[in-house]
Regions:
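Short acidic/glycine- and proline-prone juxtamembrane loop motifs at membrane-interface regions
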Residues: 53-63
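Hydrophobic, aromatic-rich transmembrane alpha-helices
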Residues: 116, 175-196
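Transmembrane-helix motifs of polytopic, lipid-linked glycan transferases
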Residues: 11-32, 70
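Transmembrane-helix signature of polytopic, membrane-embedded enzymes
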Residues: 24-47, 65-66
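Membrane-proximal, lumen/periplasm-facing interface regions of secretory-pathway glyco-
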Residues: 250-297, 305-322, 326-327, 350-353
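Membrane-interface transmembrane helices that cradle and orient dolichyl/undecaprenyl
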Residues: 30-35, 71-86, 194
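Perimembrane helix-loop-helix junctions
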Residues: 74-81, 94, 106-132, 161, ...
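Membrane-interface alpha helices of multi-pass inner-membrane proteins
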Residues: 85-101, 131-133, 213
Length: 494
């Protein structure tokens, strides 16, 4: 980092926000860049709630917004003059979009859909192929890790349909963009038909983002900020049309401008301790320093949340990781296999476990819950393989199944570990509904040596549920919960 501490983390976010504003400004036609337009541009930009927030909140949305602005700038120039410079800008922007967030791919697709004539242009294909080459390392990483992002977004996040997901979507979008901003954008798109390819692309991105994520509410909760990339085209169409529509210009000054007062109040509140501790932007350091005081030189192991093991080393400079389970989301810590470096090492487990955890008080008086272990053992490196093709499942039936177990780590795995024992469970998953069934190991084993594979068998009773809706997997369960140790397969029922 260029700077230490919070500024070091947020510095590039600030730079990208400034860059995003500059690039967006230069996307406006030169003849329209007047003092009046400048005034309206900054009103709309500052009043766009999440766009403004990502000027100081460091997330992948900051580069997403920057590269969206750069891509639209490049596309506008490309439409007007297909030269080498605009092609280079589009290649850099498209690559940056994909690496920032997968929503960036939607920006690219919607622009192409708005102008299918691009598909007949040789230079377009040169840009597309070059971009594909630049993102090949990421595609290979996805392949090497069994496409974790796709599995997470397509499968893991899917839940049963709830009307609540649908009904919350529109209010969340109003909060994301500012009701006055999105309302004006909808009015402009309804009132003025897009007549040029670039303007058409702006309309497609706005409508496409809101429609696409609106449809995805049928499979689960949609985070409000997932549509934030549509802010850039909203700013552009409002500022562009305000130069010829005096009523729109007045509306921007009077209503969108007035809403900035509420945003300023919100920013002031953020600077205080009035918000719940979980979402405060400061005062977090004390908790992690207190945890480090209790943990000493031992790495701190968290469960479930990726925020804690990220913030702990940031504030203390000490090691930390998270142990995920089927009850929580897969994190970057899992993909990087952070847990492996702490296997068999002393550690402090910062979580509540009945009969194990204690409450410790730091010198500052802060209470920290957790317990010490002298030899950490996790279950994420154990892999189960099984075949259910010849098994017919029915409710309450006792099933015996062959099981192949592989230990991919450099350390022996002990089932009856003195501090962190594990047990095999059969797991039934129906979207977010998870049922764990205990099983009997009919050919018992005490441990699995490093890089060893063994064969055994388990016996379990099928749960009394509608089996057609569930997939079956096998998991190792510990104090951290059932871990992801196998594929989940469809079963045959009678």
């Amino acid at each position: 980092m260029i700077f230490e501490g919070n500024l070091g983390v947020r510095f590039m976010t600030i730079v990208m926000q400034i860059g995003c504003l500059v690039v967006t400004w230069f996307t406006i036609n030169k003849s329209l860049r007047t003092i009046q337009t400048t005034y309206l541009f900054f009103i709309v930009s500052f009043a766009s709630v999440m766009f403004s927030a990502y000027g100081f909140i460091t997330t992948p949305d900051a580069p997403l917004l920057f590269f969206t602005a750069l891509f639209l700038f490049g596309y506008k120039e490309y439409v007007e003059s297909k030269n080498l410079t605009t092609s280079f800008i589009l290649i850099i922007a498209a690559t940056g979009l994909v690496y920032s967030k997968y929503q960036g791919l939607l920006v690219i697709v919607l622009v192409i859909l708005s102008n299918l004539k691009l598909l007949k242009n040789t230079r377009f294909w040169v840009i597309a192929i070059t971009t594909l080459i630049l993102i090949t390392p990421h595609l290979y990483w996805q392949y090497a890790n069994e496409f974790p992002s796709i599995k997470y977004h397509v499968l893991a996040r899917a839940t049963a349909f709830k009307w609540g997901f649908v009904f919350e979507y529109l209010p969340n979008q109003l909060a994301t963009f500012n009701p006055f901003v999105i309302g004006a954008a909808v009015f402009v798109m309804y009132r003025y038909k897009a007549t040029e390819p670039f303007e058409k692309a702006l309309y497609y991105i706005i409508i496409g983002f809101i429609a696409f994520f609106g449809v995805t509410t049928i499979r689960g909760h949609v985070e409000p900020h997932w549509t934030v990339a549509a802010t850039i085209p909203m700013i552009l169409i409002l500022v562009n049309k305000s130069t010829t529509d005096t009523k729109l210009a007045t509306y921007i000054k009077k209503y969108i401008g007035s809403s900035i007062i509420l945003l300023l109040i919100a920013r002031i509140i953020i600077c205080t301790t009035l918000l719940p501790e979980r979402i405060q932007f400061h005062s977090k350091q004390q908790k992690y320093l207190a945890t480090q005081e209790i943990a000493g030189t031992r790495p701190v192991i968290y469960s479930g949340s990726f925020q804690n093991p990220s913030l702990y080393p940031f504030f203390t400079g000490k090691n930390s990781t998270v142990i995920s389970s089927l009850m929580s989301r897969i994190t970057q810590f899992d993909l990087w296999k952070f847990q492996q470096q702490f296997q068999t090492k002393k550690a402090f487990i910062a979580m509540h476990v009945d009969g194990k955890s204690n409450t410790y008080t730091s010198k500052s008086g802060m209470k920290i819950e957790g317990f010490y272990v002298d030899s950490l053992q996790t279950t994420d490196h154990i892999r189960f393989n099984f075949d259910v093709k010849n098994i017919l499942f029915s409710k309450a039936k006792t099933v015996e199944m062959e099981l192949s177990i592989t230990n991919s780590s450099n350390h022996e795995f002990i089932m009856d570990h003195r501090e962190l024992p594990a047990r095999i469970e059969v797991v039934w998953i129906n979207k977010k509904d998870i049922i764990c069934t205990p099983c009997i190991i009919t050919r018992p084993f005490a441990s699995i040596k490093a890089h060893q594979s063994i064969k055994t068998a388990i016996q379990f009773v099928v749960p009394d549920v509608n089996l057609e809706n569930y997939k079956l997997g096998v998991s190792l369960s510990s104090i951290f919960g059932p871990s992801m140790n196998s594929e989940f397969v469809t079963i045959e029922t009678k």
